[in-house]
C-alpha cells in the first residue's frame, strides 16, 4: 500500500535544484544523501468477491448489524464492523492493537495446544512427570528436576533461571529478527514476515493468503478465550481442561460453570 520511494512535485526545494539518483529508494538534497527503507506494509488485496473484506463483508450480527463505524472499512482481516468502545478510531492505536491481537492470538493457539496435548497423551498411556499444564512447571523444583516429555535424555532441567534465560534468548532472537526486518531488511511486513517464516509458501497466492489471515484471527480469538477458560478452571477446580471436560460429560448437572460459580470459595 505504501510506496517505496519519495516523489517531489517541484524541481526545486528551498531554491536549490533537487537531483534524483538512479536508485528509486534514495534521494539527494544538496550534498546530503538519504535512503528510505520500504514501508511496513506491501498490501495484497483480496478479490472483491471475498466475504471477509470490503463494505459487503460478513458483519458481527449478520443482516442485523446496522451501520459500521466509518473507520472500519473491511480493509483488514477480522473486521466485523463492531467497535462500540471506539478502540480503532485512532489509526495509530488501531495499528498497535492489530499487532498485539495477532501476536497474542499466535501465542494463545500455541498455549492452548500445550495445555491440552500433554494431558491427552497422558490419558492415552504416555508417561509424564506431570501432564496438567499449570502443575508441570513445579516439577523443576522436585529432587529429580524436570524432564521434557518425561524423558531425561531430551532436556533435563533443574534450574529455573537457566530455563528462563534460554527462553528469553531464543524467543527474543526470533522476535528481534521479525521486528527488525531480518538481517538485510528484507521483511516488508513484521506481522506477516514470510520468507523463512513461511517455508511452505502459504502466502504465495494473495487470495489464499487473505483468507488465511482471517482464519488465523478467528482461531486465535477462540484460543485466547480458551486460555482464559483454562486459567479459570485451574483456579476453581484445580484440574486440567480434559479432566474437567470428562467430569462434565459424566455428570453435566453437577459439573458445569454455574454450579462451580455458585459454590466456589477462594482458598478451598
Swiss-Prot record:
Binds at least 14 chlorophylls (8 Chl-a and 6 Chl-b) and carotenoids such as lutein and neoxanthin. It is found in: Plastid, Chloroplast thylakoid membrane. Chlorophyll a 3 binds at residues 139, 149, 216. Photoregulated by reversible phosphorylation of its threonine residues. Chlorophyll a 1 binds at residues 82, 88, 101, 221. Gene3D superfamilies: Chlorophyll a/b binding protein domain. It is a multi-pass membrane protein. Residues 1-13 have a biased composition (Polar residues). Chlorophyll a 4 binds at residue 219. Chlorophyll a 5 binds at residues 215, 233. Residues 1-31 are annotated as: Disordered. The LHC complex consists of chlorophyll a-b binding proteins. This is Chlorophyll a-b binding protein 8, chloroplastic. The lineage of its organism: Eukaryota, Viridiplantae, Streptophyta, Embryophyta, Tracheophyta.
